[in-house]
Amino acid sequence: MRVNDSPSDEVYQTRLQGAQTAMKRAGIDVLALSGPDFHNYFAGLWGLPVGRPVWFVLQQYGKPAFVAPRSEAREISARCKTPVAVEWVEWEGPIAAPMTNQDALAQYTRGIAPNPGLIGLDFNCTSGANVELVRQALGAEHIKDVTPMLQELWACKDAAGIAAIRQSCDIVREQFLACRNAIAPGIPEWKVTLASVTAAIERNGELLAEDEELPRFWPHQLNMVGSGADRTARCHPSGGGRIMQDGAIAQICLCGQTFRGHAACFDRPVPIGSKPLPANLRKVIDVAREAQSAALAALRPGVTAGEIHAAAVAVIKRSGWEAPFLHRTGRGIGYSDWDGIELKAGSQTVLEVGNVLSIEPGVYVQGIGGARFGDTVLVSETGYEVLTPFDLGRNI
C-alpha cells in the first residue's frame, strides 16, 4: 500500500471476523469499545481531539457501528466508513435524543440485542466513571472486561499493521536526527523537544501527502528529553528548561503513536558538546547498551517475555550498582503504546512470530546518571528484525 493509504476494507473485515470469533468463544454477545486504539484497529478512526466517550459497537454477527456525541458524528463520517448509529446530544431539541453517552449506548444495544447475555467493555481504556455509568444503564450483571481478549487478538501484527509501524519507525529516525542536531551546550532541553515535534509533523506531512483528514501530529507522540546526572537518572524527564552542559549526556526517548496511531520506541543517550564523558557515566552507557544486546540475543519465537527480561537484568546486575532499575525491559507495542505484553520478571507470556516489542532496558544510578538504548523489534521466524535504525546513535 502507498504510505498515505489506510488499510484496505479486507484488512478491517478480517480483523472484525477475528473479534467475532473471539466473542463467540468467550460468550460475549456485544462489544462496546471506547478506546481510540481499538477504533483505529477495527475502523481506521484516529485522532479525534475529544474527551467525550465514543463507543465502537460490534455483535457476534453483522457490521459494526459507532455511538457518539453529535459534535463528533460528522468528523467520524469524514474519517472512516463505519456509520454512526446513535448520536447523543447536550441540549433539548424538537426530536428527542439521548443526552448521555450511557443512555445512547443502552438505546442502541437494546435495539440490536434485546436480551444480551454479556456485553464486553475495554476496561483498560474506559474510565471507571464511564464503566459504572454503563453498568447502571445496562445492568452490572451484563458487563464484562474483555481487555485480555482484545490484547490477545492483536498481539500478532498483520501485514498492514507492520507496514504502518515501519512508517512510525521512519518518523522516529527523523526525530532523532533533529534532536541530535539541536543538542548543544547552553541550549535548553525544550528546544530539543521542539525540534523533534517539528520533524515528526514534517515527516508525517510527507508520508500522508494529500490526505485531508488525518492529523500530522498527536499528543501521544512522546518527545522526552533529559540531561545531566540528576535528570537522566530518572527515566522520563520531559524536555524542561534545564540548560544542557558540555561533557554530560541528553537521554532521548521517542516512544509513541507517530504514524496513523501506530506506535514505535526509540531511545538513545546523546553526548553534549566536546568534553569527554566521565568514566562512571561511560560505564552506565556501556552497560545499558550491553543489556539491550543481551536481550536481543535471547529473542526468538517460543521464549517467554520473562526470559528476555532476565537476560538484560543479568548484565546489569554484574555491574555492581545497588539499585539501577526503574522499569521492565520492554513491552508489546504497535497498535497502541502498550499492546499487552510485558517483558518483566516472571512473565510467562510466550513470544510469537508477529509480536512487535520495545527492547529498552535502562540503567539509572543516582549521582552519576542514566542511559537507555531502545528499539522497536518484530519477532520473526528466524529470531527478530529491528524495525528502528539500530545503528543510529549507538556508538557514542
Curated annotation (Swiss-Prot):
SUPFAM superfamilies with a match to the protein in the record: Creatinase/aminopeptidase (SSF55920), Creatinase/prolidase N-terminal domain (SSF53092)
Disulfide links within the chain: none
Domain of life: Bacteria
Alphabetical UniProt keywords: Plasmid
Pfam family, one: Peptidase_M24
Chain coiled-coil ranges: none
Gene3D superfamilies in the record: Creatinase/methionine aminopeptidase superfamily, Creatinase/prolidase N-terminal domain
Family the UniProt entry places it in: Belongs to the peptidase M24B family.
Protein's UniProt name: Agropine synthesis cyclase
Encoding gene, per UniProt annotation: ags
